[in-house]
C-alpha cells in the first residue's frame, strides 16, 4: 500500500509548490505558501534547483545512464551474467518490472512541479509585460526554463520507456492510458519551441551551462524532431496506438514489436534542421575548444574534458547537470564521473590512491585498434589500456570479465588522476558534473540532418570543423557526398563521442543498429580466430592486437603523462600514468617509487620465442596476457555479452525499460508493458 500511495503522489501529480534548499539539496522540501516561494526570481529558482537535483539523483541514474554507451558496436559492459546491462544487451525481458521505477517516478515528479510553476509565473505581471514586449528578463527565463524542463523529462521518458502516459500533471486521475510517442514528441517540440525565445543565450543574464538556455532548448527541439523521424522500435500489440501515423518497417515482429520509421520522416528532419540552425545561431558563448593553452600538453580534445576534472565549465558545454564534491552527511551527491564512466581503479572505497573506479563503460578492442586514423588525437583520450592499482601505481587492464582492472579497456575521458588534486576521501564524490550536451554534438547532429536532406556542403562544413580539432589540420577533411557522407558523419560521431552515450542512439535512429551489431560480432569472432591461430589479429589500418604484451614498472619524476611519444614505451600510448599521491591525504596508500608502466608490443606482434622477446625479458619486462584474455573468454566477448538480443539479424532492437507496476495496476488494463518486458 505504501508503494501505491507513494506512486500516486508522483504520477497523479497533485503537488503544491514547495520551498526548496539550494541547487544541490536533494532532501524533501517543506511545504510553504506558493506566493512566498515565487515572490522573487531567486526564490522561484530554488524550485527549479530542486528539479535539477532530482533529475541528477533519481532520473539520470534511475535509468542506469551508463546503459546508453554500453550497448553498441563501440562499447560494452564488463561483467559476466549481470542484469545491470540486460537492457543494453537487448534482452529487456530479463529485467524485473521495478528496474527503473525511480527514474520514471522522478520524471513525473519534476513535470508536476514545473507545471505548477508555469501556472504561477504565467500570471506574474513582470513576465506578462516582458513577453508582450518581446523581451527576455529573469521571469521569462524562469518560465522558459520550466517549460524546457517539462519537455526534457517527456523526451527522456519516450527515449527510455517508449509510449507512456501524458498530460496527467496536476490532475486527480483514477486511471491512466498510453499516449503515442509520436504525439508526445510533437508536444515536446512545441514546448521547446515556445520556451526558446523566452530564454537567455549562454552568457546572457548570468546563464551558464549549468542551466537550460535558449540554444539548448532549440537544440533539444531539433533532437526531438530527429528522434521522432528516425527509426525506432514500436509496439504492435496496442491497436490504434499511433493513430494516423504511417510506418515503414524492417525485419520481423518479435515480442509484439517491430523496427519502424514514420513515412513522413523528412518533414521531421526539416524541422530538426530549422531548430539546429537556430541553436547554432543562439549558442551564445558556447564554442568548440580548438586550442590548448597548456604549455605541457597540446590536445584540444582532452582540454574540453580537463575542465570537468578541474570542476569548471568547458566553453564547449551547452548543458550539464551541476554537482558538488564531498558534502556534509546527508547532503552528498552521486558522482558517476569517473566512477562508472572512467579509467578503472582497484583502489579502496575511501582514501584510495585513487579510490575505486568501477568502470561500467568499456571500449571494444576492434574499435580502438581498427578505426582511429594516425594522428587522431582522440584515440588516447577515448580509451586506455591501463588503469590504477589504487596504491599510486599504474596497472595493465585485463580482459577477464569483471570490474575495476578486469573487464577490458575503459574510457579515458574521465580519470581521477586528472583531477587537481584527486578527491581521495571517498568514491563517487568527485563533484564532476553530469554532461548532457556539448557543441560538437549539436554540430554533428546538424550535419547528419543536412546530409539526409541533401545539403552536402553545409553538412561537410560542420563535420570538418570537428575533424580539424581532432587532427589539428585540414589534411583530413572529408570530401564525400550523398550516402557516403552520411556514413562518414555517423563514423565521426562514433569517434568523437565513444563512451559518452550517443553511438547506440545514432545507430537506432538511422536504422543501422542490427546491421552493425551483427558486423561487430563477426569482427570479434574473426579476431579471436586469428589470435588463436596466429597469435595476433591484424586490422585494415595495419595495427595488430597480440596475445601477449610486455610490461615493466619504471620511474618518472612526474608519473602523470600527457601527449604520446612513440619513442618512449612509458609515454605510448599517451595520457595515462598516475597522479603523485604522495602529495595527497592518501599518501599512506602509496607503494614503491616506480609508478609508471612501459609497454612493448601493444600494436605489433612480438613472437614470444623471438630474440626480441628474450631481450625484453632480460631488460626486466614481463610477458603479460593481452588478447589471450579475450580468447579465454571468447563467448563473453563474441556472443553472450555482445548484443545477443539481435544476433538473429532481422529482429527489432529492444532497448526500453519497464513502466512501473503501479501504473499498470491502476490503468484498468489500458497501460501494459511491451517489447517482452515484465507485467508484474
Q: Which ranges hold each PLM region?
A:
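Bacterial Sec-dependent N-terminal signal peptides
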Residues: 1-29, 506-509
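Long, intrinsically disordered, low-complexity segments
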Residues: 19-21, 107-110, 246-260, 306-338, ...
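An aromatic- and glycine-enriched ligand-binding surface/loop that stacks and positions planar moieties
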Residues: 21-88, 164, 211, 215-218, ...
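Conserved, well-structured interaction surfaces
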Residues: 40-59, 80-161, 171-209, 409-439, ...
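Alpha-helix C-terminal capping/termination sites
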Residues: 156, 160-163, 227, 231-234, ...
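Flexible, polar/acidic helix-loop-strand segments at domain edges
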Residues: 367-438, 661-680
Amino acid at each position: 500500500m505504501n508503494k501505491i500511495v507513494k506512486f500516486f503522489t508522483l504520477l497523479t501529480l497533485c503537488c503544491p509548490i514547495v520551498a526548496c534548499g539550494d541547487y544541490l539539496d536533494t532532501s524533501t522540501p517543506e511545504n510553504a505558501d506558493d506566493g512566498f516561494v515565487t515572490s522573487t526570481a531567486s526564490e522561484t529558482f530554488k524550485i527549479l534547483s530542486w528539479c535539477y537535483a532530482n533529475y541528477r539523483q533519481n532520473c539520470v541514474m534511475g535509468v542506469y545512464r551508463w546503459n546508453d554507451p554500453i550497448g553498441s558496436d563501440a562499447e560494452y559492459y564488463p561483467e559476466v551474467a549481470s542484469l545491470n546491462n540486460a537492457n543494453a544487451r537487448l534482452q529487456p525481458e530479463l529485467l524485473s518490472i521495478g528496474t527503473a521505477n525511480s527514474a520514471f517516478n522522478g520524471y513525473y515528479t519534476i513535470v508536476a512541479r514545473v507545471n505548477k510553476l508555469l501556472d504561477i509565473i504565467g500570471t506574474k505581471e513582470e513576465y506578462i509585460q516582458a513577453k508582450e514586449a518581446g523581451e527576455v528578463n529573469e521571469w521569462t527565463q524562469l518560465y522558459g526554463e520550466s517549460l524546457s524542463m517539462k519537455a526534457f523529462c517527456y523526451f527522456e521518458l519516450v527515449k527510455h520507456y517508449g509510449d507512456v502516459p501524458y498530460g496527467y500533471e496536476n490532475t486527480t486521475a483514477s486511471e491512466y492510458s498510453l499516449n503515442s510517442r509520436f504525439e508526445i514528441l510533437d508536444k515536446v517540440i512545441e514546448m521547446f519551441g515556445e520556451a526558446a525565445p523566452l530564454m537567455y543565450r549562454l552568457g546572457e543574464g548570468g546563464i551558464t551551462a549549468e542551466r537550460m538556455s535558449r540554444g539548448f532548448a532549440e537544440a533539444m527541439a531539433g533532437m526531438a524532431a530527429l528522434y521522432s523521424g528516425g527509426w525506432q522500435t514500436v509496439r504492435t500489440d496496442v491497436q490504434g496506438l499511433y493513430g494516423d501515423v504511417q510506418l515503414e518497417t524492417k525485419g520481423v515482429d518479435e515480442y509484439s514489436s517491430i523496427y519502424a520509421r514514420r513515412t513522413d520522416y523528412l518533414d521531421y528532419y526539416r524541422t530538426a534542421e530549422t531548430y539546429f540552425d537556430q541553436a547554432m545561431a543562439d549558442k551564445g558563448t558556447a564554442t568548440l575548444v580548438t586550442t590548448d593553452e597548456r604549455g605541457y600538453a597540446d590536445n584540444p580534445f582532452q582540454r574540453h574534458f580537463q575542465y570537468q576534472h578541474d570542476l569548471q565549465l568547458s566553453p564547449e558545454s551547452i548543458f550539464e547537470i551541476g554537482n558538488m564534491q564531498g558534502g556534509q552527511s546527508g547532503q552528498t551527491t552521486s558522482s558517476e564521473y569517473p566512477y562508472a564512466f572512467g579509467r578503472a581503479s582497484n583502489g579502496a572505497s575511501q582514501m584510495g590512491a585513487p579510490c575505486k573506479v568501477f568502470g561500467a563503460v568499456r571500449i571494444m578492442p576492434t574499435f580502438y585498434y581498427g578505426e582511429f586514423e594516425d594522428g587522431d588525437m582522440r584515440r588516447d583520450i577515448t580509451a586506455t589500456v591501463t588503469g590504477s592499482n589504487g596504491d599510486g601505481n599504474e596497472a595493465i587492464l585485463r580482459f577477464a570479465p569483471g570490474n575495476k582492472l578486469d573487464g577490458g579497456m575503459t574510457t579515458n575521458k574521465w580519470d581521477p588522476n586528472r583531477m587537481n588534486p584527486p578527491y581521495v576521501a571517498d568514491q563517487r564524490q568527485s563533484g564532476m558534473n553530469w554532461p548532457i550536451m556539448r557543441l560538437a554534438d549539436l554540430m554533428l547532429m546538424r550535419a547528419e540532418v543536412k546530409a539526409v536532406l541533401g545539403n552536402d556542403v553545409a553538412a561537410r562544413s560542420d563535420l570538418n570543423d570537428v575533424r580539424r580539432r581532432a587532427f589539428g589540420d585540414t589534411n583530413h577533411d572529408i570530401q564525400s557526398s550523398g550516402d557516403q557522407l552520411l556514413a562518414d558523419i555517423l563514423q565521426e560521431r562514433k569517434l568523437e563521442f565513444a563512451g559518452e552515450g550517443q553511438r547506440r542512439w545514432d545507430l537506432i535512429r538511422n536504422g543501422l543498429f542490427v546491421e552493425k551489431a551483427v558486423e561487430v560480432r563477426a569482427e570479434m569472432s574473426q579476431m579471436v580466430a586469428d589470435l588463436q591461430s596466429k597469435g595476433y589479429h591484424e586490422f585494415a589500418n595495419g595495427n595488430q592486437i597480440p596475445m601477449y604484451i610486455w610490461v615493466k614498472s619504471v620511474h618518472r619524476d612526474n608519473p602523470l603523462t600527457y601527449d604520446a611519444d612513440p619513442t618512449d614505451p612509458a609515454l605510448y600510448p599517451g595520457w595515462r600514468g598516475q597522479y603523485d599521491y604522495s602529495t595527497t591525504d592518501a599518501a599512506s596508500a602509496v607503494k614503491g617509487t616506480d609508478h609508471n608502466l612501459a609497454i612493448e608490443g601493444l600494436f605489433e606482434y612480438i613472437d614470444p620465442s623471438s630474440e626480441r622477446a628474450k631481450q625484453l625479458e632480460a631488460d626486466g619486462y614481463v610477458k603479460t596476457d593481452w588478447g589471450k584474455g579475450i580468447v579465454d573468454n571468447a563467448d563473453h566477448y563474441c556472443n553472450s555479452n555482445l548484443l545477443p538480443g539481435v544476433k538473429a539479424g532481422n529482429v527489432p532492437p529492444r532497448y526500453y525499460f519497464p513502466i512501473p507496476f503501479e501504473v499498470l495496476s491502476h490503468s484498468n488494463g489500458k497501460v501494459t508493458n511491451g517489447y517482452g518486458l515484465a507485467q508484474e
